[in-house]
Design a protein with these regions (language model features):
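Flexible, active-site-adjacent loop/turn segments at secondary-structure boundaries
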Residues: 70-75, 153, 190, 224
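Short clusters of hydrophobic/aromatic residues that line enzyme substrate/ligand-binding pockets
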Residues: 77-79, 161, 226
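Structural alpha/beta surface segment adjacent to cysteine/selenocysteine redox centers
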Residues: 88-94, 99-173
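C-terminal cap of thioredoxin/glutaredoxin-like
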Residues: 2-5, 27-37, 41, 45, ...
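Extracytoplasmic thiol/disulfide redox context detector
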Residues: 2-127, 241-249
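Surface-exposed charge patches
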Residues: 139, 176, 206
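Internal amphipathic alpha-helical segments of the cytochrome P450 catalytic fold
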Residues: 22, 147-151, 185
Length: 249
């Protein structure tokens, strides 16, 4: 499958959904599924300009751990527990259902601290034009240890940036967010422009496709997609399901 995350694709804009290799759990079917289950489906998107978003590095509680096929598991939301099961949220920062799911997932991470690993990975959807730029902004913030702060900011302000079509305007707004969060805006903007910034997002996307993720939010335990959980699930439901799937009593 051809990757949608080449620099050329980022500069050109969105690729056709068919080129991304995912069924459109988010075309006509997605809206009905979303309203029924609280999750918005869709195929992954490459609609972003390299000048519209950032890269990142690790923080104590929300760090990007190195791996994928080399061990990468995404951003950690709690302490690493070697050998323990891993619960992962596949998210899209423009998805309104992800905005509802992530705070609960963060609470679940606290309850599972020292018991299970809890991580977040990217799954930008083709139906969301600014999903990749938003993911880039989170990556850029992570470079300064503020992945979680930027993610929360983007979820809280979705209506302010989701419809922006001008790349420079989007870039300026994300830089304003970075300033509000106390980031070095020069370094943040440099990360947005860096072609390396897209790589963790691409890695997350490819891994999501590999394990069968078709929409967001999607929860997985040890790379097994979990059915029956969505943005309407309670924190207790998340915790109990994750523990059961990981064999934790």
């Amino acid at each position: 499958m051809t990757s949608p995350f080449t620099r050329r694709a980022l500069l050109i804009g969105a690729l056709p959904a068919a080129a991304l290799g995912l069924s459109a759990c988010g075309s006509s079917q997605a809206s009905s599924t979303a309203s029924a289950s609280g999750s918005a489906g869709g195929s992954a998107s490459a609609s972003a300009s390299a000048s519209a978003i950032p890269s990142s590095s690790a923080s104590e509680t929300a760090s990007a751990s190195a791996t994928a096929d080399d061990g990468y598991v995404g951003y950690r939301l709690n302490r690493e527990v070697p050998g323990a099961g891993t619960a992962t949220l596949y998210t899209d920062y423009q998805c309104p259902y992800c905005a509802k799911a992530e705070p609960k997932f963060e609470e679940a991470a606290k309850k599972l601290d020292g018991i299970m690993n809890v991580t977040v990975r990217n799954m930008p959807l083709n139906m969301h034009a600014n999903a990749v730029p938003a993911a880039l902004a989170v990556e850029a913030a992570e470079a300064q240890g503020k992945h979680l702060e930027m993610a929360d900011k983007l979820f809280a302000t979705q209506n302010d940036w989701k419809g922006i079509k001008e790349r420079d305007k989007l870039r300026t707004l994300f830089n304003d967010y970075a300033k509000e969060l106390g980031l070095n805006t020069e370094e943040f903007d440099k990360a947005l422009l860096d072609s390396e910034t897209i790589k963790p997002i691409q890695r997350d996307y490819e891994h999501a496709v590999k394990i069968g993720v078709k929409g967001t939010p999607t929860f997985a335990v040890n790379d097994k997609v979990i059915e029956g959980l969505d943005s309407s699930s309670s924190v207790d439901d998340l915790v109990s399901t994750f523990k059961r799937e990981a064999g934790v009593k």
